[in-house]
């Protein structure tokens, strides 16, 4: 237990041991982050014993992380590319895989002047903001259904005068009806794609993220089918669609009417 009077390095060792015992991956990194949140600064550079309030904060954070609450939720923000996103309970945590998708998707806009981009199932807005980061001229609209997730999308929508997107609350399964034909240059999405079986075998941290952002029916393809069927007409001739998926071949086989330009695999 973390108590007042503990030296910083001893406190971090205690936190790391408890997180490791709880099965948390990267317990050393997490312990250092929890110390930074509770006390401030780097424990390796601190010498003063912990005060009562500092120890209480660190103990509370340690208990939550040991219960496998995602570190991103405890931090309240998380880096994505070279910017920080607000994140917390009710929204999918930004992941490094999505950075790869954002860069590849932005590359599809080369030579397009003031491209119009739609980000479906936006969550924090990380994918749409990532495209905007790589293609500042892009006009990005980000759609999110969940009220809880939409609050974070709104917070992240105006990170700077340059890094700005338009948040919209709506449902992917009906929003297509509002779109004119042939007006979009790019559609991006990191939709739910886990099967019912995969939902029953989630890592504890992922299990605390919203099921609404993860589950996609028995075969994990419900959202891909909807995007392929309903959103193609919204793209201009030669427009592009960039989707994140963990079951790439199965997804590609079912996206009729599209030519697969590039597949990205991350080990």
Where are the regions a protein language model picked out?
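A short N-terminal interaction module
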Residues: 2-54, 58
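A general structural signal for well-ordered alpha-helical segments in protein cores
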Residues: 12, 31, 58-59, 71, ...
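Conserved SAM/SAH cofactor-binding pocket of Class I
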Residues: 99-199, 226, 248
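Short glycine/threonine-rich catalytic loop with a Thr-x-Gly-x-Asp
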Residues: 94, 123, 220
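Conserved AdoMet
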Residues: 35-107
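Conserved Class I SAM-dependent methyltransferase catalytic core
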Residues: 218-267
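Mobile active-site "lid"/loop adjacent to the S-adenosyl-L-methionine
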Residues: 193-223
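Generic alpha-helical structural context detector
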Residues: 32-36, 63, 103, 129, ...
């Amino acid at each position: 237990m973390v108590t007042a009077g503990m030296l910083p390095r001893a406190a971090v060792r205690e936190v790391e041991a408890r997180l490791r015992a709880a099965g948390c991956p990267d317990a050393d990194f997490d312990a250092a982050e929890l110390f930074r949140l509770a006390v401030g600064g780097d424990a390796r550079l601190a010498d003063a014993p912990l005060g009562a309030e500092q120890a209480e904060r660190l103990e509370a954070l340690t208990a939550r992380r040991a219960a496998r609450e995602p570190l991103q939720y405890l931090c309240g923000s998380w880096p994505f590319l070279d910017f920080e996103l607000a994140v917390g309970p009710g929204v999918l945590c930004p992941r490094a895989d999505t950075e790869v998708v954002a860069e590849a998707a932005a590359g599809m806009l080369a030579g397009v002047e003031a491209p119009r981009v739609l980000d479906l199932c936006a969550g924090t807005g990380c994918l749409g903001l990532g495209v905007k980061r790589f293609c500042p001229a892009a006009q990005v609209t980000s759609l999110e259904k969940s009220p809880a997730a939409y609050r974070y999308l709104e917070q992240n929508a105006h990170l700077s005068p340059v890094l700005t997107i338009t948040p919209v609350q709506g449902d992917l399964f009906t929003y297509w009806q509002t779109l004119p034909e042939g007006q979009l240059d790019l559609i991006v999405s990191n939709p739910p794609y886990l099967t019912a079986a995969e939902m029953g075998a989630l890592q504890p941290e992922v299990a605390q993220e919203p099921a609404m952002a993860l589950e996609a029916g028995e075969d994990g393809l419900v959202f891909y089918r909807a995007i392929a069927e309903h959103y193609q007409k919204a793209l201009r001739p030669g427009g592009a669609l960039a989707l994140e998926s963990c079951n790439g071949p199965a997804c590609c086989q079912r996206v009729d009417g599209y030519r697969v330009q590039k597949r990205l695999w991350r080990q």
